[in-house]
Amino acid sequence: MRILLDNISIIPVSGSNSFIEKGYLLIEDVFIKELGTGKAPEGEFDHIIDGENQVLLPGFINAHTHAAMTLLRGYADDLPLMEWLENKIWPLEAKLTPEDIYWGTMLAIVEMIKSGTTTFNDMYFCMDEVARAVELSGMRAVLARGMVGVGPESEQAIEDSRELIGKWQGQAGGRISFRLGPHAPYTCPPAYLERVMQLSDELQAGIHIHVAETRVEYEDILKQYGKTPVSHLESLGLFQGRQVLAAHCVHLNEEEIGILHQYQVGVAHNPESNMKLASGIAPVPRMLESGIAVALGTDGASSNNNLDMLQEMRSSSFLHKVNTMDPMVLPAYQALEMATANGAISLGMGNELGRLEPGYRADMIIMNLKEAHMTPRYDLLANIVYSAQASDVNSVIIDGKIVMENREIKTFDEQEVLAKARETARKLVGK
């Protein structure tokens, strides 16, 4: 398959804030073959896209989410995290069937595709169903079966993870990858994390874990183990020689920032979820300054309440400007890097995703520049980060395949997904 995108603005996110005003990009099979300015190459193409009044950029990478929690969107709001989890979310999650998880994930995929996300990093359960949804839809995903180290499910989570990695690692042409998902240091005792580390080494699988999301967690870990969460995990050896993505990292001291940098731990910043749950403000400018690959995530739709990475970019930039009282903090290009290149680096995929460069996987989005809120256009990067809306995402290409064109999803029936999701939600709450 050869696809030519011509007469289009291009933001490659290649380490500088430069962009191509009018150019072309050629896709061959699943890879970017070439891109540049001026006249496009001649030849035979399976598909040609005229990019007049549009911009091409890497697909967004949602570095931390719980996709099927779209089914819980709006079910419980305006509550503290632990009350929200223990009294509302966990009891309803206990009712979810594998089929529910499938349709909840498909609903999330509709929302993500239509807002420009091409890869998501997911932690949940019934992950066979999540993988099945990813395979069908054409999305790319890094998946982890959530593992809680206390209670009757702890052993099953180990066995499920082993089986899932054996079954799904590298499937769907490499669009599906799996890692281990120990939930958090407060739900996974040291002995359990030791087993997770052993399995990680045995299967050569990365780790996705929540870390230091709330002040209560931070203080409880300090009281229980005499160390802060990041220091506690370092003392156990969790970061040593493993590809680790730590979600949230809201409450950190300078020593912990140094530890994360030392071990090249990726961090998923979830600004809107952290704001909504009043968890705190992560020290993102300091982490970026230290060289940590800070990516962006939405968390689950039940605590956000959407999966829109354009909103996360805008929110992250604005949040840290006001928190530092410095309008120059986290400028537009840096926010875009967090949503693309840093997302790839944080997941150990920095050499194949997150940029538009020859040899990289052909994961990209085309955005419309014609609407009133995108006019005038003095600064293209600023318009994308500060003005764009999900509805501006016109087309999506993942692994060299057109997944959405002119706002129409090509790989599955969007209306069927919406109908099934509504039916599932009614069943869950008995309405």
UniProtKB/Swiss-Prot annotation:
- Note on how the cofactor is bound: Binds 1 zinc ion per subunit.
Sorted alphabetically, which InterPro entries does this protein's record hold? Amidohydro-rel, Deaminase_MtaD/DadD, Metal-dep_hydrolase_composite, Metal_Hydrolase, MTA/SAH_deaminase
Q: Does the keyword Zinc apply?
A: yes
Q: Name one GO molecular function term.
A: 5'-methylthioadenosine deaminase activity
Cofactor(s) demanded: Zn(2+)
**Keywords, alphabetical:** Hydrolase, Metal-binding, Zinc
The EC number of this protein is 3.5.4.28, 3.5.4.31
Q: What class of enzyme is it?
A: hydrolase
Catalysed transformations (reactions): S-adenosyl-L-homocysteine + H2O + H(+) = S-inosyl-L-homocysteine + NH4(+); S-methyl-5'-thioadenosine + H2O + H(+) = S-methyl-5'-thioinosine + NH4(+)
Q: Which residues bind substrate?
A: 93, 145, 183, 213, 299
Task: Quote the record's binding site residues for Zn(2+).
Answer: 64, 66, 210, 299
Pfam family name, one = Amidohydro_1
Q: List the disulfide bonds.
A: none
* Key word rRNA-binding present: no
Name the family the entry cites: Belongs to the metallo-dependent hydrolases superfamily. MTA/SAH deaminase family.
Job description of the protein? Catalyzes the deamination of 5-methylthioadenosine and S-adenosyl-L-homocysteine into 5-methylthioinosine and S-inosyl-L-homocysteine, respectively. Is also able to deaminate adenosine.
Can you name this protein? 5-methylthioadenosine/S-adenosylhomocysteine deaminase
Q: Which organism is it from?
A: Syntrophomonas wolfei subsp. wolfei (strain DSM 2245B / Goettingen)
